[in-house]
């Protein structure tokens, strides 16, 4: 079984989420500011956990001049972050998640020089939240802030969904809803592969999170293990198809709904997802009624979704 955020200390500390990119602030030389942001993936614990069980996530930020944007500078920044984490009592990360495809090669070179594994993945929800806070509250208050409006960058073309491999196809699947109050107890559930997410405090406990459950008596564990390697991100309904988005830009066709069901199902899922603050889930079990999950992932909408 691979390690997951459900047991972050199994092979080391929590994963780190990394963004190395330009910001909407002009420096004195007239060029855009660059900076690296690093935060650890939050450890999700049960409601009864103490502060020792769920420490504050590690954060690191460092500015970079535009003429030193390279893997050497980034390697040194990673080394500085590792030392700071050690001093503050954090374990070294198991992996670095990088969500910008355009910076993947540079992050990879810098990380490999320090023996760190890089995982291209959009499961950088904590980092995206932090970046959103900075774009909303920090950068606009700084000298040199580039106030809009700007032309929006071209949106990357979405990949054509790949068919779900037959070897990991389950017996059946169904839609499901989980009350937030129940989901808060997820750290105490019996879960094999998977990853949880912190639940926003502003959501009422009676709100329900939509998702799907995959069932397979013979292949549940294999399906869950395969999904773990995909880095599931979110579910989408598109032209009557149920799509799982995963990794950096992967898309998988889970099912094609009958035409007379697709529109209503898509509307119901979108409405429930919005009411749950964008949260969703994907579960893998041997059979309905089982209390153990071979796989369980909390998913979430992204800013582009």
Model-derived segments and spans:
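Secondary-structure boundary/capping micro-motif
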Residues: 1-305
């Amino acid at each position: 079984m691979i390690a997951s955020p459900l047991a972050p200390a199994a092979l080391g500390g929590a994963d780190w989420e990394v963004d190395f990119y330009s910001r909407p602030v002009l420096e004195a030389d007239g060029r855009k500011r660059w900076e690296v942001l690093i935060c650890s993936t939050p450890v999700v614990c049960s409601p009864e956990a103490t502060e020792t069980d769920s420490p504050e996530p590690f954060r690191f930020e460092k500015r970079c001049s535009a003429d030193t944007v390279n893997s050497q500078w980034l390697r040194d920044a990673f080394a500085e972050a590792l030392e700071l984490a050690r001093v503050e009592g954090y374990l070294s990360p198991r992996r670095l998640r990088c969500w910008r495809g355009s910076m993947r090669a540079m992050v990879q070179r810098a990380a490999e020089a320090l023996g760190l594994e890089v995982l291209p993945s959009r499961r950088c929800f904590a980092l995206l939240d932090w970046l959103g806070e900075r774009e909303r509250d920090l950068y606009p208050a700084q000298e040199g802030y580039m106030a809009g409006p700007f032309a929006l960058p071209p949106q990357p073309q979405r990949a054509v969904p790949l068919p779900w491999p037959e070897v990991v196809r389950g017996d059946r699947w169904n839609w499901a809803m989980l009350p937030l109050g129940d989901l808060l107890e997820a750290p105490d559930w019996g879960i094999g592969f998977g990853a949880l997410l912190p639940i926003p405090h502003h959501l009422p406990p009676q709100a329900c999170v939509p998702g799907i459950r995959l069932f397979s008596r013979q292949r549940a564990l294999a399906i869950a293990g395969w999904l773990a390697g995909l880095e599931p991100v979110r579910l989408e309904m598109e032209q009557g198809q149920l799509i799982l988005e995963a990794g950096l830009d992967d898309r998988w066709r889970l099912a094609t709904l009958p035409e007379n069901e697709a529109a209503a199902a898509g509307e119901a899922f979108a409405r429930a997802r919005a009411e749950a603050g964008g949260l969703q889930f994907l579960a893998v079990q041997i059979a309905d009624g089982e209390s153990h999950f071979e796989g369980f992932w909390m998913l979430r909408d992204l800013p582009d979704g």
